[in-house]
Amino acid sequence: MDFSISYGIQNIGLPLILSSGDLKNICFLIDTGATHNVLFDFVYEHLQDDVKLTNANNRIMGIEGHYIETPIIEATFNFEGVICTSTFSVLNASDAVLNIQNETGIQIHGILGMQFLLENKCIIDFDKLQIRI
């Protein structure tokens, strides 16, 4: 299914997609430069009953460029009827998220990285400003 990313790109220069269903209105940044998926910790705190905490950790480079050990969760998100399950590193990036929100007026809740894009065989079409999941 094709989803528009035009609003985010045209208004703030970032490709964004919103989840629907039970875990709705989770705003994800689509980031082809991110190797892992990320759910920010302030969002995880509200979704703990809806996601599965794994026994694993990831060592990822945070937004500020420092390596951080993060817990890994498994979460399922609905994108207008397309159900996608993947693992996410839970990351504290409050300062960066707040800066983006202050500059753009949009709060980002997580990042869909290459892991998600490959697992779900996503195609990003920048001519049409769409992502196919």
Roles of regions detected by a PLM:
Residues M1-I133:
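Pepsin/retropepsin-fold aspartyl endopeptidases
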